[in-house]
Swiss-Prot record:
It is a single-pass membrane protein. InterPro entries: S_torovirinae (IPR031412). GO terms for cellular component: host cell membrane; membrane. It comes from the Viruses. This is Probable major glycoprotein. Its main location: host cell. Glycans are attached at residues 81, 112, 129, 169, 173, 192, 542, 655, 682, 744, 780, 811, 815, 860, 865, 882, 895, 1213, 1225, 1267, 1274. Residues 1245-1299 form a coiled coil.
Amino acid sequence: MKKTMLAIILIPLVYAVAGETVADDEVFFLSAPQLDGTLIDSWGTDAVITGSTLMNRLWKTFTVSATHTLREYGRVAKSVNSTAATKCTHLCVPGTVLKLSVQATRSNANNNASWRFARPVITNMHELNETCIPMEYDCEEVISEKTSLNTLSITIYGSNDLKKALGENSTCNKTWTQGCAIATALTALYENKSVDARKLNILRGTSYTCLLGYLGIGELEPNSPCWTQLGPMCYGPLAEQVCVTAGRNPFGVVPRADRPVSTGVDCRVGSRADLQFSGLTKGLFAERGCDRVFVRCDLIDPYDPPATAAEFELHVECRSSFRVSGFPGEGEDMGLELAFNNFGLEGLIRTKQDRLTIITGIFDIRNNKYNALVINWIPTPELLDTFHMFMAELDTFRKIHRPTVRLGVVITGASPFVEQYNFKLLSGVVDMVYIHPQIQPMTSTPTLTCPMPIRSDSLECGEPHRQCPGFDGYRHLTYATRFLLGHISPEKLTLGLDVSCQLWGRRVRQYDTNWYFQDNLFSEVQGGWVSRGYITDVIQPNMTQAIQLNGCHGVFGPELDILLPSADATPYVGLLWSQPSDLEDAVDFSMALGITRFSIEGALGDVYMDSSENLKTVSTVHEAVTVRMRAHAMMEEMLGEGGLAAFDESMIWANVTRSTGTATTGARKRRALTTQGPDGVNRTIPFSASVQSGTSIVRIGTGPKMVCPGIIASVRGLLFSRTSYQGFYRLTFFQNLYVTQLQNLTGCTAVKPEDLPVITQATKVPSVFAIDINTFGVVNGSEYYVVGLEGTDLVQYSPQVKQSCAFINTNETFNQTFITIDERFFFTGPRPVADGFVIPAGINFFGSDNIMTVDYIDFNVTCMNYSNPSVQSCIATVCAANVTECTPRATLLCNQTAAILLDFQRSNELLKNSLVDLDLEHEKVKMFAPASGGSVPTSDKFGLSVAAITMSSAALVASTAALAVATLAASKIDGLQAQLDKTADVITELGDSIALISAKLDRNIRAVNGRVDDLQNQINLQMLAMDTNFKRLATGLKELGTTTNERLGEVMAYQQWYQQIMSLTNQVTQGAIQIGYKVGMIRTCVKSLLAGTMAGCPTDASSFRDHPGLTFRKTVRALLYRDQKLFIVNEVPQTLTARSVQVFIPSPTITEKKVCWPDYKLMHVDGKVVAPLECTGKYCSEPIEATDYQECLTNPSTCRYVCGDCYRGICYNRTTEDISIKFENVTHALSVSDLTSPLFNSIPQIVSMEMEIQDLKLELIQLQKINTSVHMENITGDIDAMKATIEEYRAEMAKLRVTGFGEWLKYFIYAILGVIAIGALIAIIFMAVKCYQARALLSMTAYQPVPTRPMGMMY
């Protein structure tokens, strides 16, 4: 029995030293940063050496028992035959005392004792006290209240049950704070309980907006921090679950192990402040609000730069003796800031060697006694690429030589230059970023700087209450990085269309109507208009502070009801700007939303500017407003009252200059966005910043703000949605697409599609406008499927197809890197996932729960056919009673019948040829008859055999099992022969029962194949009816006179002959066609059967009916020809599950000189890496384990590699550490490693599970699963009689000590009972020859055709 062992992990993990051995297959271990060989005393005082082993002359190994008090959260992890921990099982709070056992290696080299430790282990999990909470989570998860979005942080900060145990006893009495809203959302997710959405409004527009998507409120943003930390999750306290799956993650975000960064405030001291050093104390820094201290180092003379890179260190002034009274000293809380100068470095950083020389010199400054390094370099646009290369190379050097030093960078926050930074590169290189203020303070006292990590899950806005320099830039950077950290640029943010309604208010006063904001104008950051970085503050009168609603900070001071201001309140919009065009665009956007009244009373946000800058702001706003108000009035005049008139927008702006602008800002009021003229066309003014179709956000209506996921397009006032919302209409020619008019949208209430009304079908193209639903473009032709307006009515129009078959192809209108199918994302190119990349291969079906189904083809066909001499001519039929006198009269009557007889003869010959073809196919399928060398069936013996099918040894067991459903094995035929000879009497006794069963089976078979039999019977009945009717008519006519009777008799005889010939021709032609179709079907079917498929065979089995594509898969397990029937046994799955299938490419291994890619063909199914699938079309067998790749993970020496920068369309740049694929650049954290180290030491292990494969047993109960398309009469009573006879026979055979056939008879009876159990009463191959003989005897009686008399003798 295995020994259960526990251990604790403290992040970051410290893995065991080389050479460590673990005796057990499964261990739980402890690894902590403080156990580094130098702090053994921190374990406690009860460390005891329990044993020692001499390893060599210098090293000794001891087993040490000790106790350890956790200083932070401890993680209990389990590992199986690996040093890599991926899943943790317990979480221990700080202060927990643990009993440990650890192997320590002590060195006495050079008389200096040093220690090295393997991984500490706890051998008894029951010793963990109640402060260690059992739970499952990823060991790499970060615990952070500020970014508490992963499973571990949800457990700590979201669960009420665990707050006490984990030392978190705070409660949320003020639900309007951001922290309480986060706790409320996380608690709802953790406990799967409903939550009041109104308590979460404060999260909108923040870094935690994405939490709302997990709760079913709105839609999760694809590049949100929630996906990185929470991953796929379902929340379903109500009837309908809300699930965020991998299919909704279009960028394949790969979580990186980012080091946590404190969000405190740093202080900078200039290098020339050495005369002030004696006065710098810890108290002074605390008074200034400093958490860390940085010494700034400058070039001695920026205008006299070093001549070479080697002289760089000599030209930097940085005091090495700097100390602050009260601080612990250099290294712990001290940092170094290097100020670069573009002019001084431009000639020294062009080559990689020069940059490496400078980097080496940087780390030599101050003798490495600092814990953080900040590069203060604002490059020119020409040096920006060089700057990125320099930072990447600096980070690589740091990771190798100084991994404990944190790296930061100072960047500019000015727009538009900030958008030029490569934040995807910097986010993987630096730990924090500082904004360079526009006004640089010149002081020798400590000045504040505010660090900010460049991660979308931890975007801070500086610290506004600390008054950090450059605070405006921090706020702009918040928005810039939200776009630029994604995998697409801001101008391409058109993944979806959210419909948001802005909350407006209107106050009617004596002199005017005033529109005002009731919510933040820019509460959602989704459109390209944010690129210049202005932010809106909503200001209430008589307030001491501005309420900032841009998502970075909550409300300071008392709670304010900003949504419902007082009646006499006048709101103000404060704008931050960096250039006049920002303000102009803001005015454009406001006017497009209906704002026509502006009041300029000052400037907000320019707290760092002087009075001249404030004056410039006022002047710029005034000019922007007056010019646009004048343009607004001109466009109003051009629009007129009759709807949308033709106008040239560029001409208007060319004519409207600052000199023509009116002096007042109270110009004519803007018409409402949804006001319609007589023709029903929505009038809008297309300002340059107005909301247009195709942008990623549209604000409409007068109700509260709402988000409708699933809206995919907005064209000409029509909304198209993939989700069925109340108020939308269904389209009849396009499923899963719904449409409504924009002005009618009042809410986002999802309903069932069938509950929506169907849109009206128009008979012509809509006259107002028509939108092609394939391209969402406006068209005017009649060859498109369109939706549009006919007057004021919403209608659809389908093209009038003039030919019998029409194929309409949609032209390609755009290219994108992914497509959506049923609301899921599928990629057209590679994308990164954990440990590799995936390339979509499509959606395939995987089968399970296989059963046997049986079908058969009957070759026993009865057809009526006539030889040409047996069909009398027209003259012989008409003149049969009086040949001499009738013939001259009938000649004229019958001289047109040659063509009629010719048609009949052709049809008759066609039928004969079809029967010959059928007989030929019949002879072909006899190859599936029992083997000729076996037992020859006789009237009193059962003839059973195995179909002769060629197969591989691997398929032999399965095929034998399939044949057992239809027959016994051929190897038993010879052994049964002697016993069969002694069973004649028993067979005779069973004959009557078998005959009865055969009769019932015949009736069912006739029901299936009786179409020809019924045809024959109908012809005979028609002939009999005609014979009787004409005889009666002839008898009555004789009374009118002999002459008249003869004439009428001749006419009626002709009519009867004509009708019979027409009927026979028609029936024979139909028979020929039916037989011809059957011959073609059989010929195609046999070809498919020989290939092992049912592709060309008719079948009514449910698996084939529901999935026709399954017929192309090799499902045929047995074929047997018997008694003019070909029986087909298929093995098909009862369940077919659709799964996403992707090609998997493992991540490469990066060395200093090479990029090596594991060379394996792998697939990715359900999040697992598997071997290549065995598929036919879209139908696949269950995935199997990739044993060779697993062996590579377990033993890297067995791996196959292909080395090179590019592999299968994916390239790696060793300088920037970027993974480049066809449609994007992905920063994929790949560590530099040595070729001698394990190549996959960071990849979670794959546990190999061997499946127990048992021999397939031919259990008779399997017959209960037979599924057939033929349904037959119940023969239970007949079977009961047979049971008694068989039991008597078994008893007699037992007396004779003869076994085998009696057991087979028992097998036979239970096989029939198994068929009865599922209602499919068909004997198939289990029936005896006597059964078929009886069936043949009954068939001869049932199918005997009525003899044909000469046509002229029928009346």
